Amino acid sequence: HSKLASQNDRSGWHLIVLAKNLNGYKNLIKMVSLSWTEGFYGRPRIDKELLEKYHEDLIICSACIGGEIPQHILNGRMDKAEESVLWFKNLFGEDYYLEIQRHETHDPNAAQDVYPHQVTANKAILELARKHNIKVIATNDVHFVNAEDAEAHDRLICLSTGKDLD
């Protein structure tokens, strides 16, 4: 996202950023610090300009369906998805991974639309990976390890979004 986001979009896209070594860790910490001081818009955010400036020794994964590439795919914008994939590949090279997820839930309290979206996104992501010779990783959208931690996670989300716990 650019620093000048629309008034309606404060969320940004999800992206996994990992440090390869101490230098990568320093770059990651620098970006996180700047996201709070310069990129804050409803929440701390890191834009592509910061990624370009501090990209050395970082590993990037395209993230869950909340990521830029899956969102473009789900919105029917394969052209934008491919443009984004190429931007990340050009900047991060072999340290850029396309991510797929597929975890169907039988929990009646969970969002039931996530799995079909993952299936749709995965198909297009695999096509982009083949076309541009990008490695694919299979992950899960894990936010806590133990089921009993779900309530604490819900409370944390409510605190960060300013919503009430149901």
Regions found by a protein language model. Name each.
Residues 1-166:
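Phosphodiester-processing cores and adjacent nucleic acid-binding clamps
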